[in-house]
């Protein structure tokens, strides 16, 4: 049975959505319709939200799951009249923390993601800009400033992994696509050799790579299984020859791939 889940906040909704998504991911056998509702910061908006929740409950025949980070108690009380199963993320975690730390929390809206109060904001933006500027081997003369350089065949997940590490941890990650020319030379391109200590390889199952490439260039040599199998085989051989640590991205989320890379390379997150 498909369930409905709402991520509701009187701020950006980032915290409610991130934690809610992580919790729901533990129930792989249950499909969810997920809706994020940020800036529910007035009684009128809260009452409209109640109508949406109740409509979902009537449609599904079971109450929706509600993850919220609402600070205003009046708004919370309005939401509590809905036919939803409420999970107040802040109070669930902050109350025991307050007891352990013997201190009261500030419990402010969007605190961890605010620009003015977040010293990591500019670091995050700079890391994202670095990932975009150094995507897909477009530029290589800034590799000395990179924390990591991801290498692998085209469309194996390098770009989303670089952007995720930039957004979440402030990591400056570049990526370089290995081509047939690189494979035929049986060695790393010169620009990568001098940064060998920063390299991490991504590989992927050939059938998955074929499916991804087919969406971009259907019925082409680029997306054929034979070509994908050849490239993956040659790149994995190159990784072994050059002693480049690597991971198969096929069955992992970008979050898992990023965490494994940072642990294996020993790269410290600029912020957590």
Swiss-Prot record:
* Catalytically driven reaction(s): [pyruvate, water dikinase] + ADP = [pyruvate, water dikinase]-phosphate + AMP + H(+); [pyruvate, water dikinase]-phosphate + phosphate + H(+) = [pyruvate, water dikinase] + diphosphate
Q: Where does ADP bind?
A: 152-159
Q: Which domain of life is it from?
A: Bacteria
Signal peptide location: none
UniProt keywords, alphabetically: Kinase, Nucleotide-binding, Serine/threonine-protein kinase, Transferase
Which Enzyme Commission number(s) are on file for it?
2.7.11.33, 2.7.4.28
Alphabetized GO MF terms: ADP binding; ATP binding; phosphotransferase activity, phosphate group as acceptor; protein serine/threonine kinase activity
Q: Give the InterPro entries listed for this entry.
A: Kinase-pyrophosphorylase, PSRP
Its function, per the record, reads: Bifunctional serine/threonine kinase and phosphorylase involved in the regulation of the phosphoenolpyruvate synthase (PEPS) by catalyzing its phosphorylation/dephosphorylation.
Please state which protein family the record places this protein in: Belongs to the pyruvate, phosphate/water dikinase regulatory protein family. PSRP subfamily.
Q: What is this protein called?
A: Putative phosphoenolpyruvate synthase regulatory protein
